[in-house]
């Protein structure tokens, strides 16, 4: 009998072991779809981004008009741009839901997979930030100025670091050029990190909603989950296309329709919606260095999740107290997102400060406490 090239060819067998014959727990729910959805998002962003880069000019005098030219004069340029801009939003929706799933079902106990995932999140945030600067509108320019300026809070080397990042004494042409270079490079770094993420995942196999070992009961990925993922793609791509075609500027800032002007500061500088929770935490601390540290901690705290797990059960499926706390955390993040979009005045300042305090308290203190309490209640 001739060997099956799918199982013997050096390249095909890697694809086979990852996407076709991969042993998968039979009971994983739709919450396990987001990994493949993120892969689709990445592919879409790289393709649309490449097409946009062909028509973009990384120069302060031409960047804004080159984007306008793409939308007006390039065949389907408007569609490519709208898909790319809104695709970023869907990328973040998927990654936040993916992280939420991992947190709820204790997937962070696969430490290597979790840590590479957090690094992926940080890289994605960096990519989105430098990408937002490229159209060179008002919010692009001032967003770049404000966020890069935060590095000046680092003692001793801060100011030097900022000027080195800017390539001068303010955000200008060198800044735009290097941001374009970074925005082109980082998605490929994300693709590489994704392969590492998957390598670690396939070492241990997928988790499942019960959090129990399912080695005795696995089924092949194809056709069962390839079909299920296909449904997920359709469910995600439908709202993406709807948004890109019917209301492409819904999530954008109107300020970005004005070309960048260093002499006029917008009344309210704020990032895209997916960074608002972190921006709210940054603003809630009246000290610059303290704010920067809180901003960094708001994301880096994810690295601590495996060490803060005190429960004897892996998932929250059968832990009602932890479930309540989890949904309080979700609500808290939504409040932070809303506060981040509001002006810095009463009552938003105090709401932001309370929500920031609650965020760290839930993650660092309440989750471990509740986990230990549930162990006690169950006589573990």
Swiss-Prot record:
GO cellular component, as recorded: mitochondrial inner membrane; respiratory chain complex III
Organism lineage string: Eukaryota, Metazoa, Chordata, Craniata, Vertebrata
Annotated PANTHER family: CYTOCHROME B
Family, as annotated: Belongs to the cytochrome b family.
Function noted in UniProt: Component of the ubiquinol-cytochrome c reductase complex (complex III or cytochrome b-c1 complex) that is part of the mitochondrial respiratory chain. The b-c1 complex mediates electron transfer from ubiquinol to cytochrome c. Contributes to the generation of a proton gradient across the mitochondrial membrane that is then used for ATP synthesis.
Membrane-crossing residue ranges in chain numbering: 34-54, 78-99, 114-134, 179-199, 227-247, 289-309, 321-341, 348-368
Protein name: Cytochrome b
Pfam families named in the record: Cytochrom_B_C (PF00032), Cytochrome_B (PF00033)
Keyword Transmembrane helix: yes
